[in-house]
Swiss-Prot record:
GO cellular component terms listed in the entry, alphabetical order: extracellular space
Species the sequence originates in: Drosophila melanogaster (Fruit fly)
GO biological process, one term: regulation of eclosion
UniProt name for this protein: Eclosion hormone
Functional summary from the UniProt entry: Neuropeptide that triggers the performance of ecdysis behaviors at the end of a molt. It triggers adult behavior patterns: larval, pupal and adult ecdysis, and plasticization during the molt.
Tissues of expression: Expressed in a single pair of brain neurons which extend their processes the entire length of the central nervous system and also to the corpora cardiaca portion of the ring gland. These cells show massive depletion of immunoreactive Eh at ecdysis.
UniProt superkingdom: Eukaryota
Major subcellular site: secreted
Protein family (similarity comment): Belongs to the insect eclosion hormone family.
The keyword Secreted is assigned to this record: yes
Key words of the record: Disulfide bond, Hormone, Neuropeptide, Secreted, Signal
InterPro entries (alphabetical): Eclosion
Pfam families: Eclosion (PF04736)
Length: 97
């Protein structure tokens, strides 16, 4: 029995699926671009998110934790908030009355 046509059809079908659904898969570079410092072993996005949680715990309703977390993801951890530095957390503060 000649299996070459079956193998060729399977290969073509897999290739078509990859082409069709390839855009749905995230690009690897999206997750590795300046997110992780390979020399120091630091994941900047994770540090940023942890600091957002810490600030939310410390400041409660005065701090917009979700907005802080979204900015960590959007900017890939480039602007890490420091709960004791008013300038770094100013965009996430609420003025409650």
């Amino acid at each position: 029995m000649n299996c070459k046509p079956l193998i060729l059809c399977t290969f073509v079908a897999v290739a078509m699926c990859l082409v069709h659904f390839g855009n749905a898969l995230p690009a690897i570079s999206h997750y590795t671009h300046k997110r992780f410092d390979s020399m120091g072993g630091i994941d900047f996005v994770q540090v940023c998110l942890n600091n957002c949680v810490q600030c939310k715990t410390m400041l409660g309703d005065y701090f917009q934790g979700q907005t802080c977390a979204l900015s960590c993801l959007k900017f890939k951890g480039k602007a890490i908030p420091d709960c004791e530095d008013i300038a770094s957390i100013a965009p996430f503060l609420n003025a409650l009355e």
